[in-house]
Amino acid sequence: MWDLAVREEDYSAVDAMLSRYARAPLSMRLLPVFARGDSAARARFIEEATNLDSRQSQISARYVATFLEDFAAAESLARLDLAERRRPPIRLGAQLFLAWLELARGRWSAANAAFETAKRMEGASGVEIERAIAATMPFLEVPKADIGHIRLEVARVNPNDGGPAASSGLAAGLRPHLRLYLLSVLSSRLGDDQAAARYADELEALPTVDNAGPVKRDLALTARADIALRNGKAAEALALLQPVQGEVPLELAYYKVFATVREFGQEHARYLRAEALVSLRRYDDALRWYRTAFQGSPAEPVYLAPGHLRQAQVYEARGEREQAAAHYRHFVELWKDSDPPLRAMVTEAREKLARMTDGGR
């Protein structure tokens, strides 16, 4: 209910909920203060966050990034958890969050550097996998040299050495499958369709554990859909993704105390589905996916800007200028400082927005 009230910007309802929750976490109490712009109250909350030795600062940062789309404030909050007096797992989580926040800004170069910093921190494990997931995001312009390096890095990963966070359970049993999936999608990014298909074949042939059959199937289908969509085969990609319906065991959603990304959360499949629907001009269906498909995901902030851009383009194609302008405005703000390869999209969006808000002249 809190999440719904926040998404609807019903902060009176949020206040009412918090009044009934005597020990509400800092992150839940902080968000309405930031939303209202109360500078004095904001300073008090920042002081409280500074003195905590918990993950509340980075959880607050995620809320501020997701619900308020204020990436600068989110960064400031997350950096509080980098203080030397914080415990190593908290510092590592904050560093990884900052890497994903850079991706949300369209800044692969800064995100890549942040991942490198995380790799050198105490207790770091699995950072290579997180960075590989980041590099596969379809809307980013990742240099091929970086993708090639990351593919080699993933190829060298020992799938049986997942570190303490994945030392047992279903996630550990699926690490070999995740590795092959990432190798397939990274190969697709490089235009190496033969290798991408080969890795997908290996993934399908790999035995699975417990109740993870649908997870393995969906990883392989997503990899194949990625290849199809990159080759302009939207109908084929959509058909491949039809069985991918979120059959993810609860254990895989909650095996980490605090996650910056869910390795098996199917966000990539959802984004590919939305892209395929746009290509097929199934605009109503596409809009539904862009609006809601990433809600609740730890990586939701990363999908905000590309989601706004696609919604703007769809509304523009349908002649709905007011809605298109609103989404272009959000997109331009979120990616205004993106990496150079993405700036042409930002410039084009800014020009379209100017025409829409200037009476079409």
Q: Which positions does each model-derived feature cover?
A:
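Short coil/turn linkers that connect adjacent helices within long alpha-helical scaffolds
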Residues: E84-R86, E122-S125, G169-L170, V209-A212, ...
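Alpha-helical repeat scaffolds
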Residues: E9-A22, S39-D53, F71-R85, W108-E122, ...
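"A position-specific structural signal for the A-helix of alpha-solenoid helical repeats
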Residues: M28-L31, I59-S60, F97, E130-A134, ...
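Structural signature of alpha-solenoid helical repeat junctions
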Residues: D53, I90, G123, A171, ...
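Alpha-helical adaptor scaffolds
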Residues: T222-E300
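TPR/Sel1-like alpha-solenoid repeat signature
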Residues: L4, Q95, E102, A114, ...
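Residue at a conserved register position within TPR or TPR-like alpha-solenoid repeats
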Residues: A5, V33-R36, V64-A65, E102, ...
